[in-house]
Amino acid sequence: MRPEVQQLLYADETGELEGVFEVQVMDPVPVDRLPGVRSLIGGEDVVAWSHALLVLLGWGDEVGLVEAERIILGRIENPFDGVDTHRLHGVDLTFDNIAHALALGLDLNGLSHDRVRALAERLLQMSGSVFFQNGLESLVTALADPSLTEQTEGAISGLIEAGKNREASDLLPALAVLDADRAVRMIERVLSAEGLSRITALGVARTYARMPNASSKRELELIEAREDLPGANSFARRTLEDWGNAQP
């Protein structure tokens, strides 16, 4: 990748090369970079193209949103397949990354709620066949749109039925934002299918954290006590501390 492209995509306010995320969240958006980043869309360097898309979405840019619509709504084949893969599982992260970027652009720079919601609807439909880590959950949470409730619940249900309990638990916190009662029911389904295990516990804990009540407190205390659930137990502990209920 050419040095000038690296500066466009990865340099922070001081010119130090950092990463895509650091550029996505720059405040204010460096408008002088917009023409250069836009010019990378559709270019021969697929890595630069994919990262330019993520940057533009984070900045709330129309060119980025149009490109995301083309890819997610199936108007073109996914041009980024294999560009960024999960370091452990080797699965493609294209749509997870785009979902994260859409959430950032919505939160930070005013991407169109209605257009982003339409993309979220399509991504929820794709959740059984495309890998999502936390990107889809972040996007549905950022939208916090009640019209997505049934579809989010349906996506979680489909993942459970397909035996994808990790992915189901990762999406649970978004449902808690939309409908706490449904989230509790889906937690019960995940636990019935998988139990409270290393692959489900963090998602379950994050879901309880979004429903601050006495019942959630009890469940988080149980997770906190589970030494066999690293990550989830420390998250539960931090949540309880934030609630002013840390254990001695």
Regions found by a protein language model. Name each.
Residues 2-5, 28-42, 62-82, 110-124, ...:
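Amphipathic alpha-helical scaffolding segments comprising HEAT/armadillo-like alpha-solenoid repeats
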Residues 7-29, 50-60, 81-110, 133-146, ...:
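Structural detector for internal amphipathic alpha-helices that build alpha-solenoid repeat scaffolds
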Residues 44-45, 75-76, 128-129, 163-164, ...:
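Short inter-helical turns and helix N-cap capping residues of alpha-solenoid HEAT/ARM repeat scaffolds
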Residues 88, 125-126:
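Short, surface-exposed loop/turn motifs that are enriched in glycine and acidic residues
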Residues 191-247:
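Long hydrophobic alpha-helical segments typical of transmembrane helices together
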